[in-house]
């Protein structure tokens, strides 16, 4: 979807592009978070080139040092509420559905609160806990082995949140002898870490990027395309 198409459909007063500037915040929780060793170098170069071109064209490119684009968007949503429309296909951003509006660029449709509840089977305030229980191997978010969306939804409906699940885990691991409860009881810190990893930052120090900033945050293509 092109920028001009987005502007025509959504008719925003202004438009901003969020970029990643590291993930130091989450590396401190899990050093293996989003290990980039196997990331496609061609895709990285393409994203960097597009970012450079956006700045040349005078577009507003936003970043927060040490944080991800998700955190920039979450902060904007927290600051601007329903006036903010996030254009994203990232499921993690569904956590913000009560704060702002979300537009799916591939489906070309706005995601509603009922869409989110129907997809995940939990209340919107439980979505972060849902994502933490499920985990995400691609991002090195451990979660709980054997817990998928249906099981996570069942646990959250019964115990309310991760704290409630953790409080019940020792007793349930003994009384039920179920592997899922045993894994939760023996991996409490992993589950807490998973919750902290998926939690979005809503008070990021956002700055508008310049070409010099891109060098600082590691856009390797800048030297070639300057």
Language model features by range: what are they?
Residues 4, 9-16, 38, 48, ...:
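Non-catalytic nucleic-acid-binding/docking modules located in mid-to-C-terminal regions
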Residues 91-92, 150:
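Acidic, divalent-metal-coordinating active-site segment for phosphoryl/phosphodiester hydrolysis
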